[in-house]
Amino acid sequence: KKSKDYRHNFSILIILFLLISTAMFALLPIKSSAKKNDKSFVSYVENESFLNAEGRKILCFFDAGCGHCQQAAKSLDSLSLLNESFPSVHIIFSDTEEEKIPEFFDGITNEYQYQVIPFANYDTDEIDSYMEITFPDYDNPVVILYDGSRQIRLYEGTSNNEFNVEDLARILYK
């Protein structure tokens, strides 16, 4: 009889422990260890004239060795030649192929302002590298149209949301 009472009490104790443990994990918030990017893309730009520019402007995230990125840059350049009121363009490159930046601009008429940031920097708690800003949500090339500080259109990758110069022209000159 005592053995059954101990077994019964032990079973109740185990059930209570499991219920409390489950309730604890369900009700207490779990802190994510991943870095969260709450900043706007434009906040990573280190060009005051671009940041302070009123009106439309275009921010690009490119890799210097990326063929799709170079094609997007050439398309932007061609579109800019068609209209004098084309927005200013600022490019952020990753440092993985920094030595290819001069040849990236071969065949491009305009001189675009650009900056280079580290490809990856997981040693800090800050979001301060190309991968942390763009990955995993966005693929190269990333082209973003702003009106002042308000994002109007974001193109990225090479699939459904890829950069489309005709779509950009329609938005700019409608």
Question: Residues of each region from the PLM?
Answer:
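Alpha-helical transmembrane signal-anchor/signal-peptide segments
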Residues: 32-46
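Short active-site neighborhood of thiol/selenol oxidoreductases, capturing the structured segment around
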Residues: 49-70, 75-76, 88, 92
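Internal/C-terminal transmembrane anchor helices
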Residues: 5-32
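Thiol-/selenol-based redox modules, centered on thioredoxin-like
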Residues: 11-13, 25-26, 81-84, 151-174
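Short acidic, S/G/P-rich loop/turn micro-motifs used as interaction or catalytic elements
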Residues: 65-68, 97-98, 159-160
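Short, glycine-anchored, charge-dense loop/turn motifs used at functional sites
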Residues: 66, 146-153
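Thioredoxin-like thiol-disulfide oxidoreductase module
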Residues: 96-140, 146, 168-173
